[in-house]
Amino acid sequence: MAGGGEQYEASASALGYLFQFAKALHTCIEQWMNAGMDWSVAVEAADDIEKHTGSVTDLLQLKQRAEGVRLTDTSEDLWKTLRIWAEAAKAGRIDLAETNLLLLTTADLPEGSAGFCLQPQDSQHRNEDQALELLRAARKASKVSKGALLSCFAAFDRLDADDTPLQRTLISRIQVLGGTPDITDVRKSMLGIAAFAVGHEAAKAFLARLEGWFYDRVIEQMRTPGGSPVTGTEFDQVLTDLQHQFRYDNLPIDRDITGMAPDVSEAADKTFVRQLGLIGVGSERIGYAVRDYIRAFTQRSRWSDENLLRAGEIGEYERKLVEEWRSRFAEMAEDLGPEATEQEKKREAKLIYRWVDREARFQIRAGCDEVFVAKGSYHMLADELRVGWHPDFSARLMALLEPAGAR
């Protein structure tokens, strides 16, 4: 079992990654709102977050720290960041003329510190010469003889080891932003933007889906060598499609649900499966029915849990489904008459079920045209014996489902 210190480090590391993902998504949203389409964002590429807008590159280092932490001139957060950028600049992996280097930290910047002097120009505190002097002084005064901080100092020293010194150039590209929003504040900001896009009631559900897509997309980018970043065009397409799903006349259909392929054997005792067996539907089609039932049940439950449905909406939808079925069922019973054979009953019952399977495409909302919603909802009704296929479905299944002691 991990000790308390190890658990804390693991939790802090996990929170750091979540903060990184959340900030990257927030950056995409900001770019989408303000920068048109000519941009891209990548995570864990050249830096925590790598942002391109036109020909300009922004490399972001993120540091989430506990309240009250200060970014001093000997802070490991500061020097580890400097090491990353110094090594990249020295190796020619970044073009300092076209690259902005941003350190975003939730820590405070003590007045007069190097970080304080490297705030953006509009802060009116920026003083690159003083920042460089402070960093050199901190490095010189340090008594560190080994460890991570020493290697950070060495990387910074190497910038000025050649005929072309780079320390001053590097410093000129760095901006430090202290007291930046933490993961909670970043998510609150995104939730506010989501509320503006789709309304307050649907904002959480909208943001959850956008986050789900983005995290999957970033994982794909990180797992693939040279993986492509999220582009402005791609993000616009995803966001526009998601907004369309949350319109007044629509409901979202989720990919994890459309991909469900349940085990048919687990539903063998369900009443709607027995209804299909009663009329001789084959095992393959029963499998499709189970799939539609599970998908519809899961999607409807999620809509309900997320308060995306209007009062009485499911009841009204099911009323329409039952009434459409009832007229066809009555017509079937009328055509068969009281003397119909079992073979004739099954034949006509299959026609009713074929109508559900191939034609019944009643939409819960005008824009929600996913087929499994209607088909699966009919199976949900069949499971409750509110609809059926065999002319005698109610009597036969009630007898079958009745406890043995009650017969």
Please tell me what each predicted stretch does.
Residues 1-11, 64-364:
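Acidic metal-coordinating catalytic centers involved in nucleic-acid phosphodiester chemistry
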Residues 358-407:
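Hydrophobic, glycine-enriched assembly/anchoring segments
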Residues 2-6, 11-18, 22-29, 376, ...:
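Basic, amphipathic N-terminal segments that precede the first structured/catalytic domain
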